[in-house]
Regions:
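Acetyl-CoA-dependent GNAT
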Residues: 19, 23-29, 34-117, 123-128, ...
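Short aromatic/hydrophobic contact patches that present stacked aromatics
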Residues: 109-111, 139-141, 174
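Conserved N-terminal entry element of GNAT/NAT acetyltransferase domains
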Residues: 2-30, 178
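Short hydrophobic/aromatic beta-strand or adjacent loop that forms the aromatic wall/cage
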Residues: 74, 170-176
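Conserved active-site alpha-helix within GNAT-family acetyltransferase domains
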Residues: 123, 145-162, 169-171
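Conserved GNAT acetyl-CoA-binding A-motif
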Residues: 133-144
């Protein structure tokens, strides 16, 4: 049992050493788009209308990625493991309505391949994102059915504000880290 724990700990440390967070560059656009499409489907299948699930194809995600990377209000970072995109974060320096928190940056998207969950990739992306937007105060909307994401955000210091909204994916909860 002790040997198993040590082995798991060593694997976790090795994972951290091979994963790096970098600003997105054109050479990574397609891989990021594929991760976005795949994680979107995994998360939303069976929870939202199928036509909305099907809308986020790699081609559509690539179009979004190009637009977000070119927007000076946005920051797009990717997590690379052995030169393979395994996750990404998108932040806005100025939050979109209905968020009324001019002091905060908006964490608009955070997706990590399921195989990389619980290895520190999400936390590293959020930390790097805060540094990239030069703002420690973050606000986000998380869909109500995604209790895993809610738990992750609580674990890294976010809490619910009590504000909610309803979008295509259903009810969403506002969370902040300050």
């Amino acid at each position: 049992m002790i040997h198993e724990r040590a082995s798991l700990r060593q694997r976790h440390i090795m994972q951290d050493m091979t994963t790096r967070i970098v600003p997105i560059e054109p050479q990574w656009f397609m891989q990021k788009a594929e991760v976005q499409s795949r994680t979107w489907r995994e998360l939303n299948q069976g929870h939202i209308p199928q036509d909305i699930v099907d809308a986020i194809t790699p081609a559509f995600a690539l179009k979004l990625t190009r637009g977000h990377a070119a927007d000076p209000n946005q920051v797009v970072l990717i997590a690379l493991a052995d030169d393979r995109v395994v996750g990404f974060i998108e932040l806005l320096r100025t939050p979109r309505p209905p968020i009324n928190r001019p002091e905060a940056a908006e964490l608009a998207s955070l997706y990590v391949l399921e195989s990389e969950h619980r290895h520190g990739v999400g936390r590293a992306l959020v930390e790097a994102g805060r540094q990239a937007v030069c703002n420690d105060r973050l606000v986000l909307w998380v869909v109500g059915f995604n209790t895993n994401a809610q738990g992750f955000y609580r674990h890294i210091g976010f809490h619910e504000t009590g504000l909610t909204q309803t979008e295509d994916m259903g009810p969403e909860i506002e969370m902040i880290n300050y």
